[in-house]
Amino acid sequence: MTCPRNVTPNSYAEPLAAPGGGERYNRNAGMYMQSGSDFNCGVMRGCGLAPSLSKRDEGGSPNLALNTYPSYLSQLDSWGDPKAAYRLEQPVGRPLSSCSYPPSVKEENVCCMYSAEKRAKSGPEAALYSHPLPESCLGEHEVPVPSYYRASPSYSALDKTPHCAGANEFEAPFEQRASLNPRTEHLESPQLGGKVSFPETPKSDSQTPSPNEIKTEQSLAGPKASPSESEKERAKTADSSPDTSDNEAKEEIKAENTTGNWLTAKSGRKKRCPYTKHQTLELEKEFLFNMYLTRERRLEISKTINLTDRQVKIWFQNRRMKLKKMNRENRIRELTSNFNFT
């Protein structure tokens, strides 16, 4: 049950003070009242207007019940006065908890109250720090405000209007911070200059070498010349190496020509048959089994001996022609051997 803020506490107390105090509806349309006899819990207990009425106190007048709790009404009066205290506006999702406490206890929903001495001290100190103070920097007797709105000491003028502070108080800290920024820039610039100047001094020392270093450099220059000479010699040998390799290749070719090779004849010309010994042996074996190959068998042979299908086909054609020629010659020999010419 929520209570509207614009309704005064006297309007809630009227139905209780009237002879028909048990009526359930208030004259104000925005408020629904329940009698204390229905429930043990108090009417408007959240707002702190009327306490719970036990069955023993039903006979008594409700005015006595209101008088026995003067702290509630006095606290409402203090809240209503904008000059006495300042209350921060909470977001919509977090309504104010209306439970009241004795005046000695401070609530978290109320802005921290600063004394005049602390305000005078915190004013100039706030200008020195651009970031808000953490929670550990707050005073011992000050209660922190919820994290959405942190009461900064620079805006602690609470005894003026409900808008925290005037325009002059807002302008003063910003002007002081702006005046401090150029100081920090001036302080940082000489530091940067000093940092840049440090590496310059070793450079000047390194640029002026000692006589001992000069001697060592001259001594090192001598050995450096020797590698260059060795590189030249290597380049000469590299230039002559192609000639030697060509000569070796020619000699190898001559040796092969004298003995003969499978692909080259003794005279050095290339043989007509491009097949190796292994390939010809495999083809001869297959030719003994079958002179004519099917396409599937031809593909299998070509894969086994690493030849194309066309090469195997041509070889078998040539082999058949060779066999035909041999048969003809043999036939002629047989015929001529039978006849003896006198």
Curated annotation (Swiss-Prot):
Could you list this entry's UniProt keywords, alphabetically sorted.
Developmental protein, DNA-binding, Homeobox, Isopeptide bond, Nucleus, Phosphoprotein, Transcription, Transcription regulation, Ubl conjugation
> Which of the residues bear the PTM Phosphoserine?
S189
- Database matches in InterPro entries: HD, HD_metazoa, Homeobox_CS, Homeodomain-like_sf, HXA10/ABDB-like
Q: What start and end residues bound the annotated signal peptide? A: none
Task: Please identify the protein, giving its name as recorded.
Answer: Homeobox protein Hox-C10
- Pfam families, sorted: Homeodomain
The annotated crosslink position for Glycyl lysine isopeptide (Lys-Gly) (interchain with G-Cter in SUMO2) is K106, K195, K254
Compositional bias, Polar residues, is annotated for 1-11, 204-219
**Transcription recorded as keyword:** yes
GO CC field: nuclear body
Family per UniProt?
Answer: Belongs to the Abd-B homeobox family.
Q: Which CDD domains does this UniProt record tie to the protein? A: homeodomain
Say which domain of life the source belongs to: Eukaryota
Any one GO biological process? skeletal system development
Keyword Aminoacyl-tRNA synthetase set for record = no
Q: Where in the cell is it found?
A: Nucleus
Q: What does this protein do?
A: Sequence-specific transcription factor which is part of a developmental regulatory system that provides cells with specific positional identities on the anterior-posterior axis.
Q: For the region Disordered, what residue ranges are annotated? A: 1-20, 186-271
UniProt gene name: Hoxc10
Modified positions (Phosphothreonine) in chain numbering: T8
| PROSITE patterns linked | HOMEOBOX_1, HOMEOBOX_2
Identify the DNA-binding region of this protein by residue numbers. Answer: 268-327
Q: Name one GO molecular function term.
A: RNA polymerase II transcription regulatory region sequence-specific DNA binding
